[in-house]
């Protein structure tokens, strides 16, 4: 019998996997339509346009991650409030966070448009790439608010016990992006203009569509819009809770720029294009872990708010086993599929194909460990300990990766760039283990 799973339930391995299935599929599908986007740009607009898109992408993602921060941090706060039994307050907090995200989205859009050109130059855009960077970046930036709201609602659908509805909006947005990529880029030959247009239309579906659902008080979920009651303390708490996710995404943008700089220095535009392919593929594999962590987080927050320590122990134990098995499976799959996946993107250029395949095989070693580090950070966010979560993310995604990217290429050349993420994940695993052991008595997991 397929009964509805609730946050208050006792979770077995199969039950938590069922509950996390929708956010996992949601994240995987998001990565798939990003891959399709890259495929059409690379194969129909050329590797120069593909390199330009990947060069400006870190800047665009840096602004969009505000929605991810408020979504993950805010959903942890709202889920904990639901766990205490105060549903009215939970809806007030939810409504306030949506309004705050929309306002911040408008502000950041204006700022991003003003600094887009100097940012592209700073990221290393050459004269050949600059115009394409500006064109793609401008179209995406104008609709940045929808992008932020899309990330926000992905987290809150899980908290509202409506993960399948969140999946529906993600699939609808993704299919729209894929179809429009085919029409705009493949058929009409609009190049990166068409790719950008396809992306923003899909973001409008994913970011604006959920508002119609949450506007209905009797929507069947735990959350709906009410008159927002502003609370600076609650907003700060949500930001603190989600600071690790903000740090992860900001660091990813900075590290991505640093990767591109090193790759331009050692491999030229081909190096940047190869990195773009590896990022698309790695996001697909990492999305499984991210989706699982997103699915578990509201459950952890709820039971933490309800002071159910036995269930916290159970959730942590199950999750570590699931991640260990998943890491081994992903490593095997990524090594086996490195060549065919590289050929899918850059099969038209033999030299670029060889570079991409080797880079992907080395980079894929990180999949064995990254799941533990992704979950560890999300676990502390769910416990409303944003500081520990942020420290883990800061060290993992910024300090360790930046150090590795700056040092390893001098020792190993181009291979050192691909192995930088592996070194960072190994170091982060020790940090994660330290904090899990250190805080065990405090949270009684």
Where are each of the predicted segments found?
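Alpha-helical transmembrane segments of multi-pass membrane transport proteins
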Residues: 14, 29-30, 67-68, 108, ...
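Small-residue-rich hydrophobic transmembrane alpha-helices
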Residues: 50-110, 147-166, 274-338, 370-392
């Amino acid at each position: 019998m397929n009964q509805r799973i609730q946050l208050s339930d006792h979770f077995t391995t199969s039950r938590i996997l069922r509950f996390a299935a929708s956010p996992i599929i949601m994240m995987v599908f998001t990565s798939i339509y990003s891959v399709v986007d890259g495929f059409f740009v690379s194969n129909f607009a050329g590797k120069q346009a593909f390199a330009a898109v990947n060069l400006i992408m870190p800047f665009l993602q840096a602004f969009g991650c505000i929605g991810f921060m408020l979504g993950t941090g805010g959903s942890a706060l709202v889920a904990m409030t639901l766990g205490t039994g105060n549903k009215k307050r939970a809806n007030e907090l939810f409504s306030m966070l949506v309004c705050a995200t929309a306002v911040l989205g408008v502000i950041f859009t204006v700022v991003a448009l003003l600094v887009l050109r100097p940012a592209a130059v700073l990221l290393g855009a050459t004269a050949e790439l600059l115009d394409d960077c500006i064109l793609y970046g401008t179209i995406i930036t104008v609709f940045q608010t929808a992008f932020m709201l899309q990330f926000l609602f992905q987290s809150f659908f899980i908290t509202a016990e409506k993960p399948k509805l969140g999946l529906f909006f993600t699939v609808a947005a993704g299919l729209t992006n894929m179809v429009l990529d085919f029409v705009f880029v493949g058929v009409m030959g609009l190049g990166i203009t068409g790719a950008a247009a396809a992306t923003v239309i899909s973001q409008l579906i994913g970011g604006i569509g959920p508002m119609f659902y949450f506007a209905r008080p009797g929507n069947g979920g735990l959350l709906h819009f009410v008159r927002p009651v502003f609370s600076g303390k609650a907003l700060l708490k949500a930001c603190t809770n989600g600071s690790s996710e903000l740090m992860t995404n900001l660091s990813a943008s900075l590290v991505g720029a640093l990767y591109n700089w090193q790759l331009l220095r050692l491999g030229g535009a081909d190096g940047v294009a190869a990195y773009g392919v590896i990022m698309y593929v790695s996001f697909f594999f990492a999305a499984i872990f991210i989706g699982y962590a997103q699915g578990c987080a509201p459950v952890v927050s709820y039971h933490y708010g309800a002071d159910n320590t036995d269930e916290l122990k159970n959730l942590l134990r199950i999750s570590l086993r699931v991640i260990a098995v998943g890491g081994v499976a992903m490593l095997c799959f990524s090594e086996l599929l490195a060549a065919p996946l590289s050929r899918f993107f850059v099969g038209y250029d033999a030299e670029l194909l060889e570079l991409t395949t080797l880079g992907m095989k080395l980079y894929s070693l990180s999949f064995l460990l990254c799941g533990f580090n992704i979950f560890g950070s999300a676990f502390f966010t769910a416990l409303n300990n944003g500081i520990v979560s942020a420290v883990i993310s800061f060290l993992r995604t910024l300090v360790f990766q930046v150090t590795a990217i700056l040092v390893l290429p001098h020792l190993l050349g181009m291979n050192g760039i691909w192995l930088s993420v592996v070194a960072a994940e190994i170091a982060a695993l020790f940090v994660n283990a330290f904090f899990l052991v250190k805080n065990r008595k405090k949270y009684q997991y």
